[in-house]
């Protein structure tokens, strides 16, 4: 199972780096920062499906 450490999030701004991750909501997040901010917003219900785009 792929995991991402989001313990130091949320962050107020994310870089534009493109390193896509696919969330359990079948949405592609452009990088770890955007994904982790979404995890925080979801109260931890969002998880990582896999690395790369969905």
Swiss-Prot record:
Subcellular location as annotated: Secreted
GO cellular component, one term: extracellular region
Site (Reactive bond 3): 16-17
Domain Kazal-like intervals: 4-54
Signal sequence bounds: none
Top-level taxon in the UniProt lineage: Eukaryota
A Pfam entry, by short name: Kazal_1
Any one GO molecular function term: serine-type endopeptidase inhibitor activity
Coiled coil ranges: none
Carbohydrate-modified residues: 43
Domain comment, as recorded: Avian ovomucoid consists of three homologous, tandem Kazal family inhibitory domains.
Stated name of the protein: Ovomucoid
Native species: Vanellus spinosus
Highest classification ranks of the organism: Eukaryota, Metazoa, Chordata, Craniata, Vertebrata
């Amino acid at each position: 199972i792929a995991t991402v450490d989001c313990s130091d999030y949320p962050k107020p701004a994310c870089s534009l780096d493109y390193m896509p991750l696919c969330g359990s909501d079948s949405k592609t997040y452009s990088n770890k920062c955007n994904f982790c901010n979404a995890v925080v917003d979801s109260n931890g219900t969002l998880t990582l499906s896999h690395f790369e785009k969905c």
